[in-house]
Amino acid sequence: TYRPKIKVPLSALDKAVEVTGITAVLAFWIYLAINYTALPDIIPTHYGGGGKADGYGDKISILGLPAVATVIYIAITILNRFPHVFNYPSEITPENALNQYTLMTRMMRWLKLVVVVIFGSIAYQTIATANSADPELGSWFLPVTMLLLYGTIFYLSLIHI
């Protein structure tokens, strides 16, 4: 089916979320660069559902966190330029396209910020507890992560129904 190709204008809040996201990505890399040399050679590389470290590896593996977060951020940023390719719960018509595209790109914008915050939090906790005898993210981490991801989707879906 035909879907109009429309450039979605950004609101002031959308622009603020974009700036916050870019700032978070840059802060993530800077924080890691500042703290990398102080890390022990072996650090936690995986955490179980309860937040306890259950996998260890070379400290260079921590670079995967900002790398993956950056790739996801860039990929969603690029994808957001093509809202007509997304899946929508209702049919897209010329009359509702701008509204639907705006809602979807806004949700994706918030989600990419949430992803960067989650990955940054994992890196922060890994650095903070790397020298600990019992490194952990904390039992709160998984529930908070799920709340951030699904809460963002639910809230943005709910307020725009």
Predicted region positions:
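Select subsegments of transmembrane alpha-helices in polytopic membrane proteins
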Residues: 17-21, 75-77, 105-117
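Active-site and channel-lining beta-strand-loop segments
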Residues: 32-64
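Alpha-helical transmembrane segments and their helix-start/interface "positive-inside/aromatic belt" motifs
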Residues: 9-24
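Membrane-helix interface/capping segments
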Residues: 78-95
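Hydrophobic alpha-helical transmembrane segments and immediately flanking/interface helices
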Residues: 128-150
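Conserved small/polar residues in nucleotide/adenosyl-binding loops
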Residues: 159-161
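Alpha-helical transmembrane segments
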Residues: 57-73, 142-149
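Alpha-helical transmembrane segments and their membrane-interface junctions
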Residues: 114-132
